[in-house]
């Protein structure tokens, strides 16, 4: 069956700290087909002009270290140390990347939005939404991505996107030798 890497903000919009939902994290970890990875702390910005690209506005060493500490502290409170990272909103400031890279074993990033930045960890490229029909291989891998909910993204889990992903997976399984894995299992 399929496996999933769930990129989870550690305190989404400053309303849902992981430490208040340890039972959910424990349940996800118990399943065996989820990898839990980091996806920012707040997944929101102080600026109004860059969407939710939280780590794009983190432009100093002090800001980067402080936000990373807040994020990893929440993860520690649920007894989990994520080894993977994805930028909220795909973008990150070079100063943030400098401090994120050594914390994680890998970063799952968008090739174009990364702007050729060097990471101090392994990088995996992939950005195909569950709703898309033009699927891309990156270094022999396919990485579907989605959002659980929200009306600002096309790649949310609704019936139409679920049906499209089923069609895409059926085609890929028929056409290629596919092995489902989490990103951590690719290391």
Predicted ranges, named:
Residues 4, 8, 105-111, 148-187:
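C-terminal domain-boundary segment and adjacent tail
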Residues 14-17, 124-128, 153-162:
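Active-site glycine- and acidic-residue-rich loops that bind
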Residues 18-32, 131-137, 168-172:
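Short amphipathic alpha-helices and their capping/turn segments at secondary-structure boundaries
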Residues 25-26, 72, 97-101, 166-173:
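Non-transmembrane alpha-helical segments in soluble domains
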Residues 121-151:
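Charged, low-complexity C-terminal accessory regions
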């Amino acid at each position: 069956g399929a496996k999933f890497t769930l990129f989870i903000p550690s305190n989404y919009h400053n309303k849902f700290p992981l430490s208040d939902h340890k039972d959910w994290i424990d349940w996800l970890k118990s399943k065996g087909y989820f990898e839990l990875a980091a996806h920012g702390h707040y997944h929101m910005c102080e600026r109004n002009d860059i969407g939710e690209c939280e780590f794009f506005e983190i432009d100093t060493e002090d800001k980067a270290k402080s936000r990373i500490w807040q994020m990893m502290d929440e993860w520690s409170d649920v007894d989990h140390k994520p080894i993977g990272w994805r930028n909220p909103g795909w973008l990150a400031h070079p100063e943030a990347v400098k401090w994120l890279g050594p914390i994680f074993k890998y970063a799952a990033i968008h090739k174009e939005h990364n702007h050729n930045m060097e990471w101090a960890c392994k990088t995996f490229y992939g950005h195909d939404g569950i709703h898309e029909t033009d699927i891309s291989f990156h270094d022999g891998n396919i990485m579907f991505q989605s959002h659980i909910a929200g009306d600002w993204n096309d790649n949310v889990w609704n019936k139409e996107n679920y049906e499209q992903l089923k069609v895409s997976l059926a085609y890929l399984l028929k056409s290629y030798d596919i092995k489902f894995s989490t990103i951590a299992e690719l290391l």
